[in-house]
Amino acid sequence: MAARLAAVGYEVAVGSRSRYKAMEIVDGLKEKWPNYDLKLRACNNIDAAIFGELIIIATPWDSTATMALSVSDHLAEKVVISMANALAKVGNEFEPLVPPRGSVAASVQALVPRARVAAAFHHLPARELGDLDKPVESDVLICSDHKSATQAVSEITAKIPGCRPLDSGSLANATTIEAFTAVLLQLNHRYRTRSALRLTGINLD
């Protein structure tokens, strides 16, 4: 996600608990995509939260709450995107888990109430997202209790080639959006493909 946003002109801070780990990630992305002017900077998590006007928490779902709390002092009034899916591998299938608040995104909003949390980017196929030479070709369902957050996330989503942002209502809908990821993963396994979400019948013109 960091490389995708940098590729369309955003200056992106990549955060990690260790700045040196973030430097390894940034250096790796720049080496992989030398033909792109990727404006990436390596930071520890706190410095990344201070730098960013919009924050994307891209940790595994069971680390999302800890991450949000660790930088909570720097998230007030900022748009915070939760893209985690609470899933468990059971046999050959992934099954959705429902956190106490109903979704990972709602849990983040409860922990950092002064932030404007949005749920987004749950269904983007990772390989396509990471291939900067090709469009992603996916709809992005965005939900939030803050209209300004939905608008901000929609604006950056629309700049990613192939992505179409869709306002999917309040944060209560994050429960279903996160859980549906398990269905897509099962389809990928069953049909040996990499599926993405594309809805018909919606005209944004």
Per-segment meaning from a language model:
Residues 1-30, 159:
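NAD(P)+-binding Rossmann beta1-loop-alpha1 motif at the extreme N-terminus of oxidoreductases
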Residues 32-41, 113-116, 163:
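A short helix-to-beta-strand connector/capping loop
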Residues 33-79, 86-92:
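Rossmann-like NAD(P)-binding element
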Residues 80-102, 119:
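Conserved Rossmann-fold NAD(P)-dependent oxidoreductase catalytic core, especially the SDR/UDP-sugar
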Residues 93-101, 131-148:
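Short beta-strand and adjoining strand-loop segment in the mid-core
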Residues 99-123, 130-131, 152:
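Short, glycine-/small-residue-rich phosphate/pyrophosphate-handling segment
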Residues 138-205:
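Active-site-lining helix/loop region of Rossmann-like oxidoreductase modules
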